[in-house]
């Protein structure tokens, strides 16, 4: 319990900061992609540039992201908050500069089961994970991720 409380407090602090930042950011117009593969490619390209507008242009209002430990982020505004925190500079608690590379991906209709590796100048070692990306009608409808920022090993 001693470890869980600071972690939960840290998550709430990051989300509160992201909410404040999001209040100043307008959600971008949706941008439909021509194929499921184009949705996935755009996601990784936007994520690697920490391009908040491009990321959010993929997610319709009823989208959701399932995070580890049972957390579900629902709706564009909440997803915007999540990525606003993620795209902060490392000195501000974000991960801007992290690069995700697909190592393996299996496609089943409009869903991708994707193994990736993340690297960054501020990481002590590569971090691997796996996500399911569910696309629908040219958008990112849902994502199930194993990404756990607290498991990243940062350089000292």
Regions found by a protein language model. Give the residues of each.
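Bacterial N-terminal signal peptides that target proteins for export
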Residues: 1-9
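Short, low-complexity N-terminal intrinsically disordered segments enriched in polar/charged residues
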Residues: 20-57, 61, 154
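Surface-exposed, charged secondary-structure patches
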Residues: 81-126
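Short beta-strand segments enriched in hydrophobic/aromatic residues
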Residues: 59, 118-120, 146-147
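Hydrophobic pocket/interface hotspot
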Residues: 43, 55-56, 63, 75, ...
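A short gly/proline-enriched turn/hairpin at secondary-structure junctions
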Residues: 63-74, 88-93
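Short beta-strand edge/turn micro-motifs at domain boundaries
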Residues: 126-156
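Bacterial N-terminal signal peptides
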Residues: 8-18
């Amino acid at each position: 319990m001693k470890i869980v409380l600071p972690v939960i407090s840290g998550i709430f602090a990051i989300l509160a900061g992201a909410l404040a930042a999001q209040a100043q950011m307008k959600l971008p117009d949706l941008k439909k992609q021509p194929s499921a593969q184009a949705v996935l490619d755009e996601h990784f390209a936007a994520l690697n540039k920490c391009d908040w507008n491009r990321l959010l242009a993929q997610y319709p209002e009823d989208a959701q992201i399932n995070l580890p430990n049972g957390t579900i982020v629902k709706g564009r505004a909440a997803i915007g908050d999540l990525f606003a925190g993620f795209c902060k500079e490392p000195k501000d608690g974000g991960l801007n500069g992290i690069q995700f590379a697909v190592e393996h991906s299996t496609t089943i209709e409009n869903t991708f089961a994707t193994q990736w590796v993340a690297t960054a100048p501020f990481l002590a070692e590569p971090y691997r994970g796996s996500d399911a990306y569910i696309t629908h009608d040219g958008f990112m409808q849902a994502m199930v991720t194993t990404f756990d920022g607290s498991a990243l090993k940062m350089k000292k």
